[in-house]
Amino acid sequence: MQTRLLRTLLSLTLSLLILSMALANRGCSNSSSQLLSQLQNQANLTGNTESLLEPYIRLQNLNTPDLRAACTQHSVAFPSEDTLRQLSKPHFLSTVYTTLDRVLYQLDALRQKFLKTPAFPKLDSARHNILGIRNNVFCMARLLNHSLEIPEPTQTDSGASRSTTTPDVFNTKIGSCGFLWGYHRFMGSVGRVFREWDDGSTRSRRQSPLRARRKGTRRIRVRHKGTRRIRVRRKGTRRIWVRRKGSRKIRPSRSTQSPTTRA
């Protein structure tokens, strides 16, 4: 009986996974720059504590310096910014995707424990934002021809889901506050890493041989009223075009003479 139930659950999970991937494929952009811009904006939004942590602190009456300090001291261990920077792009995307999946689970647990009234609409907004980020992360991996590698789960925990003992309400509130604080900090790190992706691509374009060649070439145009036009291009040598009124165009192959001498 248990084996049949496990098989049914596994089949349902795989079906939902395939459906979510199909929906993500249908809604994916073909522009990497557009996806990167969206991910940066989404990370900035979710990294802002006003989107979730601050409303939670006010709702749970934790808005004192000591209680705020307790939140940071009980923060949940998310992947650090230095760790994220050292990851390859595929592994980074996989880590973000998997971590946000865990965050969704913790938010659902948080709702069940505390928020049985519609007094915390920010929670639903945060959930929709996370789903949007995960979709764009999947699309970015697909656009880069990378499969989302699922990394080994890190040893993290959340005050919203600790159930080894029956904690008092206050400690549970502090634990959940620490989880939200760690989540915002993680998303801020994700946004900074995504901005480094953008800076790296811009720097690569600036340092391309074509741009360097153009940068080393200088054009100077000199016009004399009604008589002649001189166009000079310099990069080691100088070419001069002289056009006189009523005469044909003269184009020397190479010259180091001044326009005045040739005229």
From Swiss-Prot:
Q: Which GO terms describe its cellular component?
A: extracellular space
* Keyword Secreted attached: yes
SUPFAM superfamilies of this UniProt entry? Answer: 4-helical cytokines
User: What is this protein's record name?
Assistant: Oncostatin-M
Query: What function is annotated for this protein?
Result: Growth regulator. Inhibits the proliferation of a number of tumor cell lines. It regulates cytokine production, including IL-6, G-CSF and GM-CSF from endothelial cells. Uses only type II OSM receptor (heterodimers composed of OSMR and IL6ST). Involved in the maturation of fetal hepatocytes, thereby promoting liver development and regeneration.
Q: Does the keyword Transferase apply?
A: no
Q: Which cysteines form disulfides?
A: 28-139, 71-177
Instruction: Specify residue ranges for compositional bias: Basic residues.
Output: 241-252
Species assigned in the record: Mus musculus (Mouse)
Q: Which Gene3D superfamilies match?
A: 1.20.1250.10
Q: Lineage of the source organism? A: Eukaryota, Metazoa, Chordata, Craniata, Vertebrata
Subcellular localization is given as: Secreted
- Which GO biological process categories is it annotated with? behavioral response to pain; immune response; meiotic nuclear division; negative regulation of hormone secretion; negative regulation of meiotic nuclear division; oncostatin-M-mediated signaling pathway; peripheral nervous system development; positive regulation of apoptotic signaling pathway
Region Disordered: list its residue ranges: 241-263
